[in-house]
Design a protein with these regions (language model features):
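FAD-binding subdomain of flavoenzyme oxidoreductases
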Residues: 109, 124-125, 129-248, 458-467
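N-terminal flexible segment immediately upstream of the FAD-binding catalytic core
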Residues: 1-69, 85-114, 261-269, 313-334, ...
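Conserved glycine-rich FAD pyrophosphate-binding loop
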Residues: 76, 83, 90-97, 103, ...
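Glycine-rich, acidic
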Residues: 238-268, 303-323
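Short amphipathic alpha-helices in soluble, non-transmembrane regions
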Residues: 13, 71, 239-245, 287-301, ...
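General beta-strand structural signal in soluble alpha/beta enzymes
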Residues: 22-26, 57-58, 78-82, 100-102, ...
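A conserved active-site cap/scaffold subdomain adjacent to cofactor or substrate pockets
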Residues: 260-305
Length: 467
């Protein structure tokens, strides 16, 4: 479908649905068609001229059903938008079409004992504000939790804060079920339990429309946020590693930031020296007493300490200096930087971190996040900053990591599989075939769909009771 055909289809849909909340002004549509893919100079260039033809914000499921029916009737692409905090162009329309702002579907549906079910458009911070008085909090969330939506986390995210305990969002037990709308002439609404629900996780909204997500929660703790500094990188790494591997220390977040990364945190400058390395931790109040001994052992110093309540009141949480917020703070100071995403081996991540830091020197700056993997192993992932020169050199850096047994989750590509070692998953494509048979959801993002005729696809990938 070319641009003129899309404009004609859009005009017919608007004429049929005039009461919906439309955004048609070109500058606003372009702005709403953007996320944080500009962290990557490669994606920034590739996606520069990509945008939707219109944006619409449904107020409820009934309006969304009308939109889906209309888009299927006119074969117009439909792309879902949450908080637009993604980093890989997850929401950027490759073939124009309708961008659906899901933030109108923002209600808590149910809160139980350690379980919450909410609509996809709700912000993660709003979920926690609701669950906290009942003694619960999210198990894992990105550093963008104040803006990011639940559906965006599910469809385009990984995990983040809390993953030191519960692993990534897709680890068994974190997601309990999802409610999904199909992209069909007569849309169906399906309840899909885990583990089948995870076939729609991190699929960029390309194989189903997430309406609700049911999550297991974590017990609420009185958290202390700390930033401790070290003169020696190995001391900082050893401190963070000891912290991570102490099961009795109750924690929510743990990140290692090599110099000069802490100096990019302009709001914290003056608390430490520019050449010092930092460890940011979020630790339960009852466990904080152990920090003093660990700091003394590894020659560290306390630079910032605040309670989580103080951080919320000031809108100044140290959690917003971790994960890809680190990259954002750095880019505000030095726009020539970019980053890579690495996954170290849980059996020897400590040595790998040291070796790779020594190998690249100042060209690649260590930003390490500690977490559990899906099997429960304590390990480390990196969002290392890179002094960007050329795309060729950036690719060489990623190859070097791989050659040293460090996995790369490439953040400089927009197709789902290319960010995950290039692996096409037939089961994910099968779900798209069943829930989006015309291929209208976020077209171009799922490479497996382009080669679906060469794959052996499951006739019932979700084990649906009506099939």
């Amino acid at each position: 479908m070319d641009s003129e055909q899309r404009k004609h289809a859009l005009a017919l849909i608007q004429q049929a649905l005039p009461d919906l909340d439309w955004t048609l002004q070109a500058t606003k549509v372009k702005r709403l068609s953007r996320d944080f893919h500009w962290f990557s100079p490669v994606l920034k260039q590739q996606l520069e001229d990509k945008q939707a033809d219109a944006v619409v914000r449904p107020r409820n499921e009934e309006e969304l059903i009308l939109l889906v029916k209309a888009c299927v009737q006119h074969q117009l692409p439909l792309i879902l938008r949450g908080g637009a905090t993604g980093n890989y162009g997850q929401l950027v329309p490759l073939e124009g079409g309708m961008l659906v702002d899901m933030t109108g579907l923002n209600q808590i549906c149910e809160l139980g004992d350690g379980v919450v079910r909410a609509q996809a458009g709700i912000r993660l911070a709003e979920i926690e504000a609701f669950t906290r008085p009942a003694g619960w909090e999210l198990r894992c969330m990105p550093s963008t939790y104040r803006l990011a939506s639940l559906g965006g986390l599910y469809g385009g995210g990984f995990g983040g804060i809390g993953s030191i305990n519960y692993g990534p969002l897709g680890a068994p037990g974190n997601v309990l079920s999802v409610k999904v709308m199909t992209m069909e002439a007569e849309p169906r609404i399906l309840q899909i339990p885990a583990p089948q629900a995870l076939l729609l996780h991190h699929a960029y909204g390309s194989n189903g429309i997430i309406l609700e997500v049911e999550l297991a929660l974590a017990p609420l703790h009185r958290w202390i946020e700390r930033l401790d500094v070290f003169d020696d990188f190995t001391d900082a790494l050893d401190y963070a590693n000891a912290f991570a591997r102490s099961p009795g220390l109750v924690k929510r977040q743990l990140a290692l930031l090599a110099a000069p990364i802490p100096s990019y945190f302009s709001h914290l400058n003056g608390r430490y020296q520019a050449n010092q390395h930092a460890v940011i931790s979020v630790i339960a109040q009852e466990s904080e007493g152990f920090c003093a001994g660990l700091l003394e052992k590894y020659r560290g110093y306390s630079a910032v300490r605040q309670t989580a309540d103080e951080a919320r009141e000031a809108n100044a949480s140290l959690m917003e200096y971790c994960w890809n917020h680190t990259t954002l703070h750095a880019l505000k100071i030095d726009s020539s930087l970019t980053y890579v995403q690495t996954a170290f081996n849980y059996t020897n991540y400590h040595q790998q971190i040291i070796d790779m830091a020594a190998l690249f020197g100042d060209e690649v700056i260590s930003h390490i996040e500690f977490l559990r993997d899906s099997d429960g192993n304590i390990t480390a992932s990196g969002l290392q900053l890179v002094r960007y020169s050329t795309e060729e050199r950036l690719n060489e850096i990623m190859v070097t990591f791989r050659d040293n047994d460090v996995k790369i989750n490439n953040p400089h590509v927009y197709q789902i599989e290319d960010g995950k070692q290039g692996e096409i998953k037939p089961e994910v494509v099968s779900v798209k075939k069943h829930l989006d048979p015309n291929g209208l959801l976020n077209p171009g993002k799922l490479r497996g769909w382009e080669v679906r005729n060469t794959l052996i696809l499951d006739n019932d990938p979700l084990l649906l009771p009506d099939r």
